Amino acid sequence: MTTASIIIGILFILCLTSSVVSRSVGLVNSDDKPSQKIWIPVTFGLSQGVMALLGSGLGRLIAHLFTYIAEYMVFAMMLVVAVKLFVDSMRVLKGKMMYTVSKESDMFLLTILAAFNTFLYSIVSVFYAPFGKWFFVAVTVAGFLWALFTVRVEFAPGIIKKVSFVEFSASVFMVVIAILYLFTDLI
């Protein structure tokens, strides 16, 4: 692996898991227990890893159908994730994607929703997964870190714009990475 492919791989995984940001902002208050402050990021991280494994398992079942067009499938799935991130960023800007959770079952559904991009891309991870078998660990760690850095952030008008910018930037970087994947040999 070259330095460029490592940097692109890290950026790709951060973009893929960036949907955690809009779903985890403001989930922990300053008066919550320390165990609550770490439990939520762990849940987000594990859901990213589990959904990546499920998507990869599904991808392995149907990979034989796409062997001749594998690079185009990877490109298309990167674009699908980029479009979903862009739509999510616009919904965040309108205030429609900020959540509060009162029950643990709601938290479970929220973490699954945050990991849906990872599931979608993992279907084609058979053909391209940055860092090979370490892809699943990297996705889990990235989901955990995104949640760890954002769960204690409180709601404010400026925060909504910043969260929207994170997801918008992730969608732009995902498109750039998709183009690099299809048209260059950097990845």
Indicate residue ranges for each PLM-predicted region.
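Helix-coil boundary and interhelical linker segments in multi-pass alpha-helical membrane proteins
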Residues: 1-7, 57-69, 125-135, 182-187
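Structural signature of hydrophobic alpha-helical transmembrane segments
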Residues: 3-20, 68-78, 131-145
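Alpha-helical multi-pass membrane helix bundles of inner-membrane/thylakoid proteins
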Residues: 85-114
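C-terminal ends of transmembrane helices
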Residues: 22-36, 85-96, 147-162
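Juxtamembrane transmembrane-helix termini in multi-pass membrane transport proteins
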Residues: 3-59, 126-127
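Generic transmembrane alpha-helix signature in multi-pass membrane proteins
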Residues: 8-13, 21-31, 106-114, 118-130, ...
